[in-house]
């Protein structure tokens, strides 16, 4: 592997780790805010205990996310110096605003954690969760703006290889910003809901602490409902993304579906094997006209093929598999959550909502949704190749030529293993031998009674 490929691998590895914690950073505040809202609204201490436990766990993931996020910022400057020299001043505003959003979130998260039972009106404490949600979401908005700029650059003029006459607001709110941000936020909410649901399902299947059954059933119900509606929004975001790509990045959409010749009634391909020399696909599931329909709501829509673009500008064909895997994981989560919600809607089927096989299905949604996030980011980043800034700078032109990058990659790989292991270990230890019913009892005692003995 040459320096460019190693630099790409290191960046991909860093992003793959960071996106886990970034997703939690956007989704978890929403979940513990909903739990607290339900706890106050229903006067139910089970939900209050959820909010307290989830917020406590969230602090650990925030700490690790700060580390991985800082590393990404450093790697932009150290591994991709030519890119930062050319466009660093253009993306400076969203990078600064992302830092501001993080500190905004951190301040209110601290207040949220240390002011339980400090207010006579319980809704006052709940309101503190809203700035935490805003901070996490805006942090995602601003960092997504940087990535969107790399896909659809705007707000500058290029003179003598330099970006001049910069319009920071136009650059930040570039053409793909709204669609991509919507997709990021909805999928983060979806993923966090399903991760929580899968943990609740796991606890119910093991049933090592019967006194926690009510707690986990309520956590399961809440998170699956949130997951279902978040999945609907994510599917809408995905549909809007396809239409955006058709208009602004047609070569990317064509690569996703191995669509080589411009045509209407373009078919959607699921999986299969491509012979790049003959451009023939074998073994794929073909859905006639669906690619055209995704592009512009009509099977008659003409979709540009890859053969309209120079071969040197074609994204890697492997992106097709990432697209199919992302969609498959999303559909799996949608079907399972949809079936669960249907069992709640009809009284005679409610007993199946906590059936063993339903719980096994829900157990899959956590890993599946997180994998969908990972595949989605591999898809969008590899789909931009060979550009680091589409139409202006190639990846090969932006990478560092400094030696020792292989050694640095190995060091970071070891660091990420240690970080992931430490985070998992601390989270497990945080709740090991500390059943939820004990937290519920402590809350009940403060109100003059005890639920469980």
Mark where each language-model region is.
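Polytopic transmembrane helical bundles with strong interfacial aromatic enrichment
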Residues: 1-453
């Amino acid at each position: 592997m040459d320096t460019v490929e190693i630099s790409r691998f290191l960046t991909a590895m860093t992003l793959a780790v960071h996106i886990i914690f970034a997703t939690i950073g956007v989704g978890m505040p929403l979940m513990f805010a909903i739990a607290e809202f339900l706890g106050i609204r229903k006067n139910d201490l089970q939900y209050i205990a959820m909010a307290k436990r989830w917020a406590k766990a969230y602090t650990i993931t925030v700490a690790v996310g700060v580390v991985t996020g800082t590393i990404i910022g450093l790697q932009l400057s150290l591994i991709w110096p030519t890119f930062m020299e050319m466009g660093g001043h253009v993306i400076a505003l969203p990078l600064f605003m992302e830092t501001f959003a993080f500190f905004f979130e951190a301040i209110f998260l601290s207040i949220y954690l240390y002011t339980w039972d400090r207010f006579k009106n319980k809704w006052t404490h709940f309101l503190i969760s809203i700035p935490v949600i805003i901070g996490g979401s805006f942090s995602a908005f601003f960092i997504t703006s940087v990535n969107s700029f790399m896909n659809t650059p705007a707000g500058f003029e290029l003179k003598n290889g330099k970006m001049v006459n910069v319009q920071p607001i136009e650059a930040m709110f570039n053409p793909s910003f709204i669609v991509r941000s919507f997709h990021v936020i909805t999928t983060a909410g979806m993923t966090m809901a399903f991760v929580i649901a899968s943990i609740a399902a796991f606890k119910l299947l093991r049933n090592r602490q019967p006194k926690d059954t009510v707690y986990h059933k309520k956590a399961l119900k809440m998170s699956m409902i949130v997951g279902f509606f978040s999945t609907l929004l994510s599917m809408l975001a995905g549909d809007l993304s396809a239409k955006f790509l058709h208009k602004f990045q047609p070569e990317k959409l064509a690569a996703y579906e191995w669509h080589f010749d411009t045509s209407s009634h373009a078919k959607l391909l699921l999986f299969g094997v491509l012979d790049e020399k003959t451009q023939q696909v074998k073994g794929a599931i073909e859905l006639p006209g669906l690619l055209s329909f995704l592009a512009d709501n009509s099977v008659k829509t003409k979709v540009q093929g890859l053969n309209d673009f120079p071969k040197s500008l074609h994204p890697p064909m492997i992106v097709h598999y990432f697209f199919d895997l992302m969609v498959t994981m999303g559909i799996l989560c949608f079907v399972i959550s949809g079936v669960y919600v249907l069992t709640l809607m009809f009284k005679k089927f409610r007993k199946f909502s906590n059936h063993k096989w339903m719980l096994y299905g829900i157990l899959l949604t956590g890993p599946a949704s997180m994998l969908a996030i990972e595949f989605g980011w591999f898809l969008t980043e590899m789909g931009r190749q060979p550009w680091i800034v589409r139409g202006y700078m190639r990846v090969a032109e932006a990478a560092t030529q400094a030696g020792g990058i292989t050694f640095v990659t190995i060091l970071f790989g070891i660091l990420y293993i240690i970080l992931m292991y430490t985070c998992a270990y601390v989270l497990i230890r945080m709740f090991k031998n500390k059943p939820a019913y004990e937290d519920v009892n402590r809350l009940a005692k403060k109100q003059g009674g005890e639920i469980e003995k």
